[in-house]
Amino acid sequence: MTVTAYIALAVLAIMIYLIIKQYETRLVLLGGGLILCLISLQPMQGLHSFATNMVNGSLITAICSAQGFAYTASYTNCDRSLVYYLSRPIRNLGLFLIPLCAIITFFINIAIPSAVGVGAVVGSTLIPLMLRAGIKPAAAAAAVLSGTMGSLLSPGLSHNAYVSEMAGMGIMDLISYHSVYSFMIGGVAAVGVFLVCMFLGDHKGEKVDVNNTDDGFVPSPIRALVPLVPIVLMLVCTVWFPELKMGVTEAMLLGTIACLIVAHPDAQIFSKKFFQGMGDSYGEIMGIIISAGVLAAGLMASGLIDALIKVMVASSDVARWGGSFGPFLLSIIMGSGDAGAMAFNGTVTPHASEFGMSIEGLGSLAFLAGACGRTASPIAGITILLAGLAHANPFDVVKRTIAPMFVATILLAIFMV
């Protein structure tokens, strides 16, 4: 390796330390990338990458429209209605609430692709439900946390848009490609957390009388259907009416219109919520993609990626395990399933064919493994949120998820590529 490649390794180590210390992820990615470009005497590479990713049309439209729809569904309580009706039949199932709550969260997360968003909505209902049944707080939080990988099957997930564009295929085609593996790790998570909680005796806790805040919420069966509208539209049009070319943006806009018609809220506030969601998603999600792109440019300029690719070309097993456990470990350390997977997919995945893999295969492997790592991270935002809702320690929560996620990552590496 070159001198700059060794410097890049040192910079990466410092970046990981800063992220562990809870420095702002986008700042660390952006700063590290620009420093590497400067050290490599190619300062414009990082700036060009920033400018290019800022206007990535297919990513912006899919991500921003999906988040805009999610904000309107939250404002009109359509998401809470969906959770309410899905959770009613399972109130008295005792220990079996753990896998069932994980499964319910998984499917709701497909409709609401934000892990933190679905955690707030689902957790506020299902966690008190489990606490009342005598399930320990850490186990209740872990059950919901293990279900937050349903977004892998959502057309609004940024990774689906990113990898599908790189592979030159439609978003629904990519989801169809990795759906079996996404369901596999979802099943491993639900069953695995259930077994760990049973081993730890988490169903033998005291029944807690949790009083939900009476905020005037009244569930509506019609509103409960609204979060499902975009997904149903895309599935129906993809299978039976492909000539309509129903994209993510069109489906999300139609879902937003359905939300407005069904809930008939204050139209002005509704409009503000939609565009607030679009703006927030650009800053939060696109911000990570843009910053990861700058880091990717820095790693390329330093020569570290070229050295890594040579190693992977020499052995496909290195690519298989590196593409799975690399993002998995980075996501545990960073507390984000996005940053590590985005950096890997922006640098290594475009060269997948050189070590006998497809772009969609390696790219999907990276972000599925990244999701597993985030679900096993005590510093992930969703873990901290759910631990707070359950009044549990985040480390006690991931004690129940890390083993199933480790097993899921091994299975991905074995079967996916």
Regions found by a protein language model. Name each.
Residues 1-72, 81-85, 89-91, 230-290, ...:
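Hydrophobic transmembrane alpha-helices of multi-pass solute/ion transporters
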Residues 2-5, 55-60, 87-103, 132-140, ...:
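Membrane-interfacial loop-to-helix junctions in multi-pass transporters
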Residues 22-25, 58-59, 70-80, 109-121, ...:
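Short helix-coil transition sites and intra-membrane helix breaks within transmembrane domains
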Residues 57-63, 174-190, 244-253, 361-370:
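Alpha-helical transmembrane segments
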Residues 62-65, 91-127, 289-292, 315-355, ...:
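Hydrophobic alpha-helical transmembrane segments of multi-pass integral membrane proteins
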Residues 128-222, 382-416:
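Membrane-core helix-loop-helix motifs of multi-pass transport proteins
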